[in-house]
A protein has these predicted regions:
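Alpha-helical metal-binding/catalytic segments enriched in His/Glu/Asp
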Residues: 50-51
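Extended beta-strand/beta-hairpin segments
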Residues: 1-45, 56-133
Length: 133
């Protein structure tokens, strides 16, 4: 897999993958236009959206409507020196009262299959190089 990163002006940096563009920008207070999520926002959103696709698939397989199902992702942080560090990611699956109770724990288990979560739990090695072409 290859993702091409391009610079499109100002503080905008895009990722191009499989013919699609994922735009990023920085907030105005950091010199950007605030026209797109930051790379870190995309990273955090990838956790919730990955969990979401597993919940969606689970419900589709059982013909359960997702019209009133949502996920909420929240975070706990801690100040360490001059930095704020992410210490906990909280995912809540909000289901309507008629959602079958027998599937409550199954939703948690299916979210544990999320590839993004698995990658965070077992981080890869990074190999960063400068190449002159």
């Amino acid at each position: 897999m290859e993702i091409k990163i391009t610079f499109t002006g100002g503080k905008k940096v895009n990722a191009e993958i499989d013919g699609m563009v994922i735009p990023t920008d920085q907030p105005r207070k950091y010199g950007g236009e605030g026209s797109a999520p930051t790379p870190y926002d995309h990273f955090l959103a990838s956790i919730g959206t990955c969990a979401g696709i597993y919940v969606l698939s689970f419900c589709e397989e059982r013909k359960i409507s997702t019209d009133r199902i949502s996920l909420v992702e929240r975070f706990e942080t801690e100040k360490r020196g001059d930095k704020v560090v992410l210490t906990k990611i909280i995912l809540e699956v909000i289901v309507p009262p008629e959602f079958p109770e027998k599937y409550h724990n199954a939703l948690i288990k299916v979210i544990d299959q999320c590839a993004v979560k698995k990658t965070i739990m077992n981080p890869p090695k990074f190999d960063i190089k400068t190449i002159v072409k």
